[in-house]
Regions:
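Carbohydrate transferase catalytic cores enriched for Leloir-type hexosyltransferases
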Residues: 1-347
Length: 347
């Protein structure tokens, strides 16, 4: 937003793990990027206090109401990514549920501004905290990944194919393995397909670490299906993958599957939009709000329906007349990303 950039400078406090995401802003005179040591909490707290007290900071986003945050509450703009602990409480332990509820009650009980990433989240706020005092702004976001996707050269694509042994057509499932990401419906759909002898010449590619500290028994259930004789030859578990490599994998997939049960505003879908990819998308309300014309909705609780949707989409992708549609037009995707970013910043 040009009006904001003329009036304010931004100081971004970033942990080292995510610092490279913001490299593209280093040349912007209005953006000051500061990487902190996330392992030293005391040092970070002192740095934050010094920055806010003496650095002329007017607003703090997204402020957390911890001991430091409470000192600067008047400057705070809050953000709650989603209300998963309310919609899917069975995925959380009692201690974590209590902690999240305490934080959300403190934020929603304040008259500070509250940013939410979707109108679906705004409806949840009204449903779960009808007496809230915060002033709400819904601000959608895009994936600003133009530098990363432009770094995907034919040479990089070839090296990624060789590194991860991606010789066959494949379908990509990019999420981390939290239970709410709902990989179980995907692996059960794969099992249905392969038992019937369909898509045996396809690979199903997963990235992210096969862990969920909240629900280890869920991971055991996933692992049992993935390692079964029926599906193991067609499943590739790549683990944690570097960001540009991940985008190269997405770019060259036949299509993407996103079966999640809860999202605030899905980054996977925004990435896929920039690459102009076809996405099979769970039909949860936020996805219905976020989808574009290249999305196909399915019931996230019905593996047989998903299996049929995958088979039908794969058949369409194999037809020469649809080759360009499934390859994706990255230039068009980048243009759409900028258009949407302008629209969101004016909202």
């Amino acid at each position: 937003n040009e009006n904001i950039m003329e009036r304010f400078s931004l100081v971004l406090l970033i942990d080292p793990e995510h610092a490279d995401i913001f490299d593209c802003f280093k040349e912007n005179v209005n953006v000051d990027i500061r990487v902190y040591d996330g392992n030293n909490k005391i040092k970070l707290a002192l740095y934050e206090m010094r920055l806010i007290w003496f650095g002329g900071v007017k607003y703090c986003y997204a402020l957390e109401l911890n001991k430091i945050g409470k000192l600067f509450k008047k400057k705070g703009i809050f953000w709650i990514p989603d209300f998963q602990h309310r919609t899917l409480p069975e995925f959380f332990g009692a201690e974590e549920l209590a902690h999240k509820e305490k934080n959300d009650l403190a934020m929603t009980g304040s008259d500070n501004p509250m940013v939410l990433s979707s109108f679906d989240a705004a409806r949840d706020l009204e449903r779960f905290y009808p007496g809230h005092r915060c002033s709400v702004e819904v601000v959608h976001f895009v994936s600003y990944i133009e530098p990363e996707v432009r770094a995907i050269t034919p040479e990089l694509e070839q090296s990624v194919r060789e590194k991860f042994d991606l010789k066959r057509n494949y379908i990509y499932i990019p999420n981390q393995f939290w239970q709410h990401k709902n990989h179980i419906v995907m692996v059960e759909a794969i099992e249905c397909l392969l038992k019937e002898g369909r898509l045996c010449d396809y690979d199903f590619v997963f990235t992210g670490n096969l862990k969920d500290y909240r629900n280890p028994e869920y991971i055991d259930k996933l692992r049992k299906i993935m390692e079964s004789d029926t599906v193991c030859a067609n499943i590739k578990l790549l683990g944690f993958v570097e960001r540009t490599e991940q985008l190269a994998i997405m770019k060259n997939a036949q299509f993407i599957v996103q079966p999640s049960l809860c999202e605030g505003w899905g980054t996977v879908l925004e990435d896929a939009k920039v690459l102009d990819k076809v996405v099979l998308l769970s039909n949860i309300p936020v996805h219905q709000e976020q989808q574009n014309k290249k999305c196909v909705l399915f019931d996230p609780h019905d593996p047989k329906q998903l299996a049929e949707t995958i088979a039908r989409t794969a058949a369409r992708a194999s037809l020469p007349e649809h080759e360009a549609e499934y390859a994706g037009n990255m230039e068009q995707g980048i243009a759409n990303m900028y258009r949407e970013a302008r629209e969101y910043s004016r909202a």
